[in-house]
Amino acid sequence: MPFLETIVELAPRLRRKEVSPLELTRACLDRIEKLNPTLNAFITVTAESALAEARAAEIEISRGEWRGPLHGIPIALKDLIDTAGTRTTAASALYQDRMPTEDAEVVRWLRQAGAVILGKNNLHEFAYGGSSLVSFFGDVHNLWNAAHIAGGSSGGSAAAVAAGLCFAAIGTDTAGSIREPAALCGCVGIKPTYGRVSARGVIPLSWSLDHVGPLAATVGDAAAVLQAIAGYDSLDAHSADVPVCDYVSVLREGARTLRVGVPRAHFYDDLEDEVRAAVEQALAVIETLVAETREMQIEIPTDRIVQNAESYAVHADHVARTPDLYQPETLRRIRFGADISAVEYIRCRLELDIERRRALNIFAKVDLLVTPTTPMPAPAIADLKKDPEALRPAELILLRNTRPFNVWGLPTISVPCGFTKSGLPIGLQIAGPHWREDLVLRLAHAYEQAVNFSAK
């Protein structure tokens, strides 16, 4: 069953023509047909074009025109990433028939790498939430227990990867929306440095905080996808012209020389017992893999005014004209930004830039930080829906540990580190200095190899 293999394992087999891109694509489409009615991970499945892309990849590979490790690999996209000729809805009635005429830059790079696009993943409407329970197309469910959330806002992407509906997915992360669902669904999700991956052609939530990155089954697969999409886009005002290293090759360097910081305050406060136990076990393993671990204190930044003001700026015209096309909870959140003054926003936006410079000081004596990704495992859907006032507080708790790294703009990954007694996944978060995705990936890979949770 090819869906049990990783991209890293399949790539050389595809190149040697031992496995067919058509075989992989059909296997994914079969699993989508079987499991998507339960998970609701996909809004749109582009079966016909995916099979055509797979056939084209097969022909190219047969001619010796292998493009790299993503050639012929089926991948999905969060449905706020533009795709030419395929609707991009942001999980909203407002955009249910929106048909882009151009691919987002990240999609263009994936196509250049030879990836097969399977379709568009469900999400929390306009990426404004951490549960994926607010979507015009219905709730996303967790593979490990369909009565629990998949997280958000990239909930459909995480659920699809965890269930083997695709080999990887591209998500977005404004406060944790790649890492939190990856943790809750038991897969790997990396938020690169702010500006590392182009966000041009991605429907924004907050320009200053939005990041684009991959979700995958393993660290190696996430590295392979990140390799294909990282780079400078001169037409994206937030893109940075910083060299990209070979993320796959650096995994072989291991973590033996790395120094790890453990910021106990905030990140380790008020953890559920099973999360605390799993993370402490993970730290014990990491101590055997690295040069040094040390506890440290970090001042935690805030971003609410920037996010609220920018999200309102994105939606103000539609909110004024067609408020009924938004889900009520999304509309309420967007309106948080309506009364923020220009003076207040500019001051807070300047402070965000200062915080990103201050983040350099975090790594004066350590190379990486390690924290729990979320303070608790995936909540039950029924618990969040029985009280309308319970949803946002629960989401804020789930995103508590991921949010600061969006303010700092630091590269950060979530990797599986255990399960609760009821079988729900638990995630470990690793963060590094700006532009040092390589360090983050090295420790994540070394830990993954030591514990082998991905095999489960």
Label each PLM-derived region with a short phrase.
Residues 48-58, 114-115, 124:
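Long amphipathic alpha-helix in the N-terminal Rossmann-like dinucleotide-binding domain
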Residues 9-12, 16, 59, 268, ...:
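Serine-dependent amide/ester hydrolase catalytic core
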Residues 28, 50, 72, 78, ...:
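Conserved hydrophobic/aromatic pocket- or pore-lining residues that grip, position, or stack substrates
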Residues 34, 112, 162-269, 280-289, ...:
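Structural helix-boundary/capping segments
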Residues 70-212, 265, 371-391:
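Short glycine/serine-rich loop/turn segments
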Residues 1-52, 62, 288, 456:
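An N-terminal boundary/leader segment
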Residues 70-90, 249-263, 294, 305-360, ...:
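Short helix-loop capping/hinge segments that flank enzyme active sites or metal/cofactor-binding pockets
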Residues 10-16, 94-99, 210-217, 334-341, ...:
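Short, well-ordered beta-strand elements within core beta-sheets of diverse protein domains
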